């Protein structure tokens, strides 16, 4: 039903897909349920909106370096509490969730809050939606030659604002994606894996405080020896060892199990 990340020119290689070091001028684009990467571009600072824009539809220009200004339209999903300048955005036609400081990033221009609001829809199967959260899955994607490619991943949570969408990440490409997974499940393109290997969550005493890494600065050593810095911005409720990380030099949101990798 969809194409995988690799099959088009300009995307990052399979070797890069498992690491955080990726060029910040690439975006993953979906056209007719196909994932691609395309370059985008930065511009001049914009005046700061005075009202809360979470849940709003927005559009803005984007210009990177000396490139042309391109126009982007999307939905603001969240404002990050540990960095209120940072917004999580789902752009139209793109599968990734992007993190941008909309009012500070010089690449953003002419930010406009649109009058149309996001339509709310009733979830078709609330029990299935709850069941798949936190589960390992196999997600089938249609390649450009019509064959199927299987991607293993984890369903992280229901997405905010767009209530029939789910956050998901993949072993081959640990960034944050959004899909309407109930549709994929019903079409046979999503399979929930048995969780016999998952240990039950540890029992907590009433009032027990569990340490969280949210708000912590992190440093990532790339294979070439260089380092990149970022911040832990979210802890996944269904899998508390899994966190979202926003690196300073990239607008993708990375998803890592920091217990396994520490």
From Swiss-Prot:
Keyword Protease appears in the UniProt entry: no
GO molecular function: DNA binding; histone H3K4me3 reader activity; histone reader activity; methylated histone binding
Alphabetical UniProt keywords: Acetylation, Cell cycle, Chromatin regulator, Developmental protein, DNA-binding, Isopeptide bond, Meiosis, Nucleus, Phosphoprotein, Repeat, Ubl conjugation, Wnt signaling pathway
Residue span of region Disordered: 1-49
Biased composition (Basic residues): 27-38
Chain segments carrying region Tudor-like domain 3: 213-262
Modified residue annotations for Phosphoserine: 109, 124, 199
Annotated coiled-coil segments of the chain: none
Positions marked as site (Histone H3K4me3 and H3R8me2a binding): 173, 180, 184
Pfam families documented for this protein: Spin-Ssty (PF02513)
Glycyl lysine isopeptide (Lys-Gly) (interchain with G-Cter in SUMO2) crosslink site(s): 7, 28, 44
Gene3D superfamilies (UniProt xref): Spindlin/Ssty (2.80.10.70)
Location of the region described as Histone H3K4me3 and H3R8me2a binding in the Swiss-Prot/TrEMBL record: 93-98, 142, 250-252
Superkingdom of the source species: Eukaryota
Annotated region described as Tudor-like domain 1, given as residue ranges: 53-116
Main subcellular localisation: nucleus
Family from the record: Belongs to the SPIN/STSY family.
Quaternary context: Homodimer; may form higher-order oligomers. Interacts with TCF7L2/TCF4; the interaction is direct. Interacts with HABP4 and SERBP1. Interacts with SPINDOC; SPINDOC stabilizes SPIN1 and enhances its association with bivalent H3K4me3K9me3 mark. Interacts with SPOCD1; promoting recruitment of PIWIL4 and SPOCD1 to transposons.
Function, as annotated: Chromatin reader that specifically recognizes and binds histone H3 both trimethylated at 'Lys-4' and 'Lys-9' (H3K4me3K9me3) and is involved in piRNA-mediated retrotransposon silencing during spermatogenesis.
UniProt remark on domains: The 3 tudor-like domains (also named Spin/Ssty repeats) specifically recognize and bind methylated histones. H3K4me3 and H3R8me2a are recognized by tudor-like domains 2 and 1, respectively.
Name of protein: Spindlin-1
